[in-house]
Regions:
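Substrate-binding/charge-relay-adjacent region of secreted/lumenal peptidase catalytic domains
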Residues: 1-35, 42-43, 47-322
Length: 325
């Protein structure tokens, strides 16, 4: 289905206009943001108006670790006015906090791996300086061809101003003996320089790794979406759902324990994933490196137990774990 066909099937212009008129009557300014499409409204008003409308209080929060840049203004809870209840599923920038994180284990945690199986030992011959190469992955997964159709587009998603270095991608390609390929387009935050990446490895580790390997295994047009938003649902609605020609495969390596994700955030993302599925888009999500227990159990065995991870738990994505060899 095309975007217009899905919009005709799912949009609710009556509800959208009702919310639009109500916000204006309360004194809010409606922002003409075309990226929101027929599903969302963006508005600006003094914080006192939002506190009164949603029966809440906003505060400035910063992470206790000090690693987060700046603070965010959020509330602990909010209530949608009864008059809007039938038309509003969630309100962004209220209770959504930056829980999302990379689903990969730190490098040091991989160094104490158990003894390899016989199959893994055979695959070890395809290692290069003890690093996993695209050639090894091709062998392990039975991939016979890495070239793809130019219309089979793919994309990497990144959060929290994570970056990548185009020069680092070229270095990787040269190191493993692949032809040089470039990212077709960067939307949002990124790229950066090698110097910035070297100064802070965490700044580029996710973006560099994700791009290097997806481009190596599937040589098709590749896009990089970098967002500073804390909301996965907000990003996917604005940048992907509203695109007339979104990437055909979207890879997401970020996630959070589902208990920390608001119901509105979850439902909005799920609706967007369903919308994109109708349009032939596949969303691939990392289920993490920690099995069912989530990262909380890495250093605290008492926290072992089943902990669903979002967005991997969404029924309209393909959750991907590891393969043991």
């Amino acid at each position: 289905m095309t975007k217009d066909e899905v919009d005709d099937l799912t949009a609710n212009p009556t509800a959208l206009q009702f919310v639009h008129d109500h916000l204006k009557s309360m004194g809010a300014t409606i922002l003409p943001d075309q990226s929101l499409g027929p599903y969302n409204i963006k508005a600006r008003a003094p914080i006192a108006l939002w506190e009164s409308m949603f029966n809440t209080e906003f505060y400035a929060y910063s992470h206790v670790s000090g690693h987060s840049s700046g603070s965010v203004v959020r509330a602990e809870k909010y209530s949608v006015p009864t008059i809007l209840d039938a038309h509003v599923s969630s309100v962004f920038n209220t209770i959504q906090t930056p829980h999302m994180k990379s689903q990969k284990l730190p490098l040091a945690n991989h160094l104490n791996a158990p003894k390899a199986s016989s199959k893994a030992q055979k695959l070890a011959s395809l290692l290069l300086d003890n690093l996993t190469t695209p050639q090894l992955l091709n062998n392990a997964y039975g991939i016979s061809e890495n070239s793809g159709h130019p219309k089979a587009t793919q994309a990497i998603f990144s959060m929290y101003e994570q970056l990548y270095s185009a020069d680092d991608i070229v270095t990787f390609q040269n190191f493993v003996g692949l032809p040089q390929e470039k990212v077709n387009q960067t939307i949002g935050v990124g790229p950066t320089t090698v110097a910035v990446c070297n100064a802070d490895n965490d700044k580029c580790a996710e973006g560099n790794a994700d791009l290097s390997y997806i481009m190596a295994l599937s040589n098709t047009p590749t896009y990089y979406y970098g967002t500073s938003s804390f909301s996965l649902a907000e990003w996917i609605q604005a940048d992907i759902v509203q695109s007339s020609d979104p990437p055909k495969v979207i890879s997401i390596s970020y996630g959070a324990d589902e208990i920390y994700v608001s119901q509105g955030e979850y439902e909005d993302f799920k609706t967007s994933a369903l919308n994109l599925g109708l349009r032939g888009v596949t969303i691939v999500v990392s289920s993490g490196d920690d099995g069912v227990s989530s990262p909380q159990a890495r250093n605290t065995p008492a926290k072992c137990g089943y902990m669903p991870g979002f967005p991997a738990s969404c029924p309209f994505v393909t959750a991907v774990g590891a393969t043991q060899v």
